[in-house]
Amino acid sequence: MTTLGTPLSPSATRVLLLGSGELGKEVAIELQRFGVEVIAADRYANAPAMQVAHRSHVLDMLDPIALRTLIANERPHLIVPEIEAIHTEALVALEREQGQKVIPTARAARLTMDREGIRRLAAETLGLPTSPYRFVDTVEEYRDAIAAVGLPCVVKPVMSSSGKGQSTLRSEADIDAAWEYAQTGGRAGAGRCIVEGFIDFDYEITLLTVRHAGGTSYCDPIGHWQQDGDYRESWQPQPMSAAALRRSQQIAKAITDDLGGRGLFGVELFVKGDEVWFSEVSPRPHDTGLVTLVSQELSEFALHARAILGLPVGAQDGGVIRQAGPSASCALLAHGNGVPAFDNVAEALRDPDTALRLFGKPRVDGHRRVGVTLARADSVDAAREKARVAAAALTIQLQA
């Protein structure tokens, strides 16, 4: 797609975002820079991407009839899934029956909507190294799986994100509570889970991998710190050996080549010395990649927009995306119930090498990521400290 129309006209190039969170918001902004007509959909009103889209829709995207009706009415040129909780079989059928273009492909959306599809592809079809694992449906299978993979281990619903339903089991005392949380915390309610054995790794990375008209390109590796299964900080570049980086790129290319299509993929990997293990992949921008808003000339969102529109992504020789220097991000979390408001914004931005993104989440119930601070410095450690200081300066209030 190299001819782009004018939004809100008969020539418009229309893109439908399925999921309208903070990552979708940044994708929508990048698409609008190219005059794309953006339609945002999600299960709740006033989601972040809806605030910058040409129009929006609220629906249950796990309902195939509602999803098909939306697509029939909007007639998008591209469908861009931004979350996992979508009736992907409907997308597969539409791609097969009507030639509907799903990014990167409907098959990729289906395989990555839950952990089972992508883990079986990576480990059993492609033979990529992974942690030991078992899939379970019942509490009896769950206990057998723990016995098989050993403690410590991790249990996750096959369909969840941002750490929801995920627990780390370090002793037998954790077993019952972890099962209960896995059955209540996933996106699709009670059901199938994965039990994963621990890997003794040095660090985790996200390798942002872009499939585009000119081939496959890679961003510098992103290191990250998680708590309760959810991203708290990320930084770029993550130092690693040349051998580990080559192996990471080989694994990323193997999985993204199999998934196919065009767009940006977030490939999560465990690294120990020169050894690398595949963890997960998202066929869309990744939350740890928010750091690229300041660390790269083209952010992960700009790269995704360019790739899906068939435009050059500005890769250097060797397929590496240009990086702007050591950078870091720190997530802003709100706890409680209400509509978020932010104080001390000027203080948070006092350092000229810091930036701030407030997502526009309409409400917090419990705990929610509502923004991110970003920083550049002469080293990754200094950038991380700047991002933390900026985050600590902000005060988040929840208003009734």
From Swiss-Prot:
Residues noted as binding ATP in the record, renumbered to the chain: 115, 156, 161-166, 196-199, 204
Listed SUPFAM superfamilies: Glutathione synthetase ATP-binding domain-like, PreATP-grasp domain, Rudiment single hybrid motif
Organism: Xanthomonas axonopodis pv. citri (strain 306)
List of residues binding Mg(2+): 268, 280
Coiled coil: none
Sites where the protein binds N(1)-(5-phospho-beta-D-ribosyl)glycinamide: 22-23, 82, 287, 361, 368-369
Pathway: Purine metabolism; IMP biosynthesis via de novo pathway; N(2)-formyl-N(1)-(5-phospho-D-ribosyl)glycinamide from N(1)-(5-phospho-D-ribosyl)glycinamide (formate route): step 1/1
Limits of the ATP-grasp domain: 120-309
Keyword Magnesium annotated: yes
A Pfam family per the record: PurT_C
Family from the record: Belongs to the PurK/PurT family.
GO biological process: 'de novo' IMP biosynthetic process
Entry annotated with the keyword RNA-binding: no
Superkingdom of the organism of origin: Bacteria
Protein name per its UniProtKB record: Formate-dependent phosphoribosylglycinamide formyltransferase
